[in-house]
Amino acid sequence: VPVIAAKWGWEMAFLVIGAIGFIWMGFWIFMYKKPHVHPLVNKAELDYINQDTIAETKANNNVEVKEKKIPFLQAFKFRQTWAFAFGKFMTDGVWWFYLFWTPAYLSDVYGLTSDTTMAKTLIFVLYAIVMLSIIGGWLPKYFVDKLGMNPYAGRMRAMLIFAFFPLLALLAQPLGHTSYWFPVIIIGIAGAAHQAWSANLFSTIGDMFPKSAIATITGIGGMAGGIGAFIINKGSGALFDFSSGTTLINGKAEVMTKEFLAAGAQYLDMPMKFFGFEGIRAGYFIVFCVCAVAYLIGWI
C-alpha cells in the first residue's frame, strides 16, 4: 500500500486494493463448492471434514436432531451472547488501532513517513511478528489433548494467557525513547496476541451455542466489534488533536503541527502532559494503556 500511495497517490491505493478484493470475490463465487460436491475433495478429506458430524450422529443412535434456530432478538436474552459481544467490543478496536495508526505513530513520533525505506521495513517486521498468532490454535489444543480439559475451558485458559501479552504496550512509549524498534516489536507481539485471542474467541461460539445459532451470534459480535473499533479510532484521533495543543491561524484555533511550530507559531492551548510525555506522545501513551488492558477486561 505505501508503494502504491507513493507512486500514484493514496486514492489509487484504495482503488487497487479494492479491485483485488473483487478479483478474490470472483474466485470465491465461481470456484467454491461445498465439500461433498467439490471435485478436488477426496473421500478421506471429506470424512475428516465431517468427523464431528459423524460423531454426533453416532452419539444420537444415528438419528439426526434438527436444531431450532434462535431468532435474532431472542439471542440477546442469553448471557453468553453478551459475553462474546463484550469481548469483541473491547478488543476489535485495538487491532484496528494498531493497523490504522501505526504508520501515523511512526510519522508523528519519529518522523518516519510511510514512503521511507525504514518505515516500510518496520511495518514489514511488525506484521511478520504478527504471524506468531498461529500459536493461538496450538495452545488450547494442548490443554485439551494433553491436560484433559474440556474445549471451552481450554480455550478460556489460552485466551487468558494471550490477554497478558498486550500489557507490553505499556512499555511501548517508555522504551521508544531508546529506539523505534521497541514499540514496533511490542505492537507486533500485541497484534499476534490479538489474532490468537480473536481466533479462540470465535471458537467459543460453538462451545456455547448450537450450530444453528453460530451465524447469528457471530454477526452480533461483529457488530459489537465494529462499534468498539469506531469508538477507539475516532476517539484516538480526537485525543491526538487535543493533546497536540492549538495555535491561532488567521484568527482561528488550529491543531498545532510540527510545520506550524517550525514556522514559529505560538501555542494558544498548551500541549497535554501525561506521565512524563508531552503533546501527541502523551496521547499515544494513553491509547496504548487502553489497548494494553482491553483484553483482560474483555476476558473477565
Language model segments and positions:
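Multi-pass alpha-helical transporter architecture, strongest
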Residues: 24-32, 167-175, 276-277, 284-300
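Interfacial helix-cap and linker-helix signal at transmembrane-aqueous boundaries
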Residues: 1-8, 106-107, 139-140, 144, ...
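Paired intracellular helix-loop junctions of major facilitator superfamily
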Residues: 144-146, 205-214
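Helix-loop-helix hairpin linking two adjacent transmembrane segments in secondary transporters
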Residues: 1-39
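Loop-to-transmembrane helix entry/capping segments in MFS-fold secondary transporters
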Residues: 114-116, 211-220
